[in-house]
């Protein structure tokens, strides 16, 4: 699987920069302006474009005749915006800073779902690809653990400005690594009469394909709760007598999620839809327990357990998108799905701000209820209507890959996509092809 290691390094570096922006923006705004609210406005401008830019970015990626230039260019644009924020925030007029934040945030979908859409071209179908998505999911969780810690450490020993420069350097590394990935020649374009990705094709696929509709609606609902978890953790730790314990709780959750993605997320024998339901339901149960624990230590244990349960959810989501996204809308499905989750998390953060006066244990129970409701929603949507018919060729390819994996061989058959390409190989494909 040539290129997968470089892809994972690029994804980790890009997501490190993305995950660190929330804390870096707030710390830098507080340091230079004395107002955390100013940082919140800038962060909102950074996050808001994700869902709006997602279909545009996905369609542009699908139509690009030079995929290397497109992916490297979007990562470079993201990095440039981060670097500009390091120098402009708190110094330049607010409209200028907000404009830079909007431009940088518009590149965000390619850092998340856009990069994940490349895995299908790097790894042939079968257990190897499922495991690759597990590793890809671990880059999100690894970045979520390390980036805020690194930003806090640099800011504590220096200032928030160098911390944001560190994030820009990580983004530059991601762009450089992405430039070294093998990309397939996209070919002369679709044949006459063949489907072409329009701006609404990703949204149409998310609605029409039952499996995609189920996982997208459920994870979007679940992420309303996840977005509220950080503020709620701070409030909960304060009521338990540890005002600084919110960071401990969220670190426990992030470490648990990383552990879950590296262990439970690599289970390929369980259908991804079932794995997603189990993950959301178990996360809800663990958070319910966290609402009633009497100390920060026990609460951290419950948060870690919730993180372990949440870890496989992203892996399962990526597998479902890869297997059921129509070929012509694959990148849009990945970018739009990621954008919806970011928007849902932002909504959750805003809602918990409005409800901050409520007892924290009530807020934790509400977040847990959203996870359980998401699991029920997935069950209801997945059970509604006939299942999408699987393409015989794709099923046969996956069966051959599983047999070879059982025999200890990872070689690909003559019909498998190229494992050395970061984009899917050209040629006719059925909509169900992963």
Enumerate the language-model features and the residues they cover.
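A single, central transmembrane helix in multi-pass transporters
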Residues: 23-24, 158-165, 204-262, 361
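Transmembrane alpha-helix termini and helix-breaking/packing motifs in multi-pass membrane transporters
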Residues: 26-32, 86-88, 146-167, 239, ...
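C-terminal transmembrane bundle of multi-pass solute transporters/carriers
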Residues: 52-56, 71-77, 239-414, 426-434
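Helix-loop junctions at membrane interfaces in 12-TM secondary transporters
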Residues: 87-101, 291-303
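Helix-loop junctions on the cytosolic side of multi-pass membrane transporters
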Residues: 121-122, 169-193, 270, 380-392
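Symmetry-related core transmembrane helices of the 12-TM Major Facilitator Superfamily/SLC fold
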Residues: 162-180, 364-380
């Amino acid at each position: 699987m040539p290129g997968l290691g470089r892809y994972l390094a690029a994804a980790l570096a890009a997501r490190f920069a993305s995950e660190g922006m929330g804390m870096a923006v707030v710390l830098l705004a507080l340091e230079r302006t004395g107002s955390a609210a100013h940082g919140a406005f800038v962060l909102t401008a950074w996050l808001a474009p994700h869902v709006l830019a997602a279909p545009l970015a996905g369609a542009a990626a699908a139509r690009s005749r030079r995929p290397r230039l497109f992916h490297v260019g979007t990562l470079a644009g993201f990095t440039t915006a981060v670097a500009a924020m390091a120098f402009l925030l708190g110094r330049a007029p607010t409209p200028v800073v907000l404009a830079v934040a909007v431009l940088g945030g518009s590149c965000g979908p390619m850092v998340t779902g856009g990069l994940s859409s490349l895995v299908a071209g790097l790894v042939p179908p079968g257990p190897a690809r499922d495991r690759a998505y597990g590793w890809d999911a671990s880059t999100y969780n690894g970045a979520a653990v390390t980036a805020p810690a690194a930003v806090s450490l640099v800011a504590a020993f220096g200032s928030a400005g160098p911390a944001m420069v560190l994030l820009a350097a990580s983004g530059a590394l991601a762009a450089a690594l992405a430039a070294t990935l093998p990309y397939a020649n996209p070919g002369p374009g679709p044949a006459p009469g063949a489907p072409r990705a329009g701006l609404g094709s990703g949204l149409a696929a998310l609605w029409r394909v039952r499996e995609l509709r189920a996982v997208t609606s459920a994870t979007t609902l679940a992420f309303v709760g996840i977005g509220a978890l950080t503020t709620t953790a701070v409030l909960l730790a304060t009521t338990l007598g540890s005002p600084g314990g919110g960071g401990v709780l969220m670190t426990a959750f992030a470490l648990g999620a990383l552990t879950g993605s590296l262990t439970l997320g690599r289970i390929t024998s369980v259908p991804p839809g079932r794995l997603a339901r189990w993950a959301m339901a178990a996360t809800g149960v663990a958070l319910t327990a966290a609402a009633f624990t009497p100390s920060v230590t026990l609460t951290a244990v419950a948060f870690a357990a919730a993180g372990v349960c949440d870890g496989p959810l992203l892996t399962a989501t990526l597998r479902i998108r890869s297997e059921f996204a129509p070929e012509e809308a694959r990148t849009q499905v990945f970018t739009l799905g990621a954008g919806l989750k970011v928007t849902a998390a932002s909504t959750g953060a805003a809602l918990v701000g409005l409800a901050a006066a409520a007892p924290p244990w009530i807020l934790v129970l509400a977040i847990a209820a959203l996870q359980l409701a998401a699991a029920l929603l997935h069950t209801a949507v997945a059970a509604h209507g006939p299942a999408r018919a699987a393409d015989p060729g794709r099923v046969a390819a996956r069966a051959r890959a599983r047999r070879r994996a059982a025999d200890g061989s990872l070689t690909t058959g003559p019909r498998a996509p190229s494992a050395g390409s970061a984009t899917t190989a050209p040629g006719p494909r059925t909509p169900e092809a992963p």
